[in-house]
A protein has these predicted regions:
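Catalytic phosphate/metal-binding cores of nucleic-acid and nucleotide-processing enzymes, i.e., regions
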Residues: 1-118
Length: 118
């Protein structure tokens, strides 16, 4: 049952990301490959999707970090966690501080260029 619930959450998350204009699909390679694949495949990201009674974002992020280091080809590890009974919008996203800082810097560069300050 846990595996089925996890697969359902991965499909739901991928569908939601697609509805937001992000190219995403469920990573189904665990059964087909010898190497690990992200739960949800989005270019540049290693997404570990967890859904439990009480999720553990820190443990999920540690799994994403380990898997991305071994198989991620430079992808940023991130954990997307949702507790049972909560709506999708209540899901949390956890990533390392350094990765978040880089995202803020990258966004600042994009905003600066868009405003014509460069």
């Amino acid at each position: 049952m846990q595996r089925r619930k996890g697969a359902t959450w991965e499909r739901e998350l991928a569908a939601h990301l697609r509805s937001e204009g992000i190219q995403a699909q469920r990573g189904i390679g665990q059964a087909r490959r010898s190497s690990e694949v992200p739960d949800v495949d989005v270019a540049g990201w290693w997404i570990e999707a967890k859904r439990h009674q009480r999720t553990n974002p820190k443990a999920a992020l540690q799994q994403a970090i380990a898997d991305a280091a071994e198989n991620g080809e430079g992808r940023i590890p991130v954990a997307v966690c949702r507790d049972n009974g909560q709506p999708l919008q209540a899901a949390t996203v956890t990533l390392r501080l350094g990765d978040w800082i880089q995202l803020v810097r990258d966004r600042r560069i994009v905003d600066t260029v868009a405003k014509g300050f460069v």
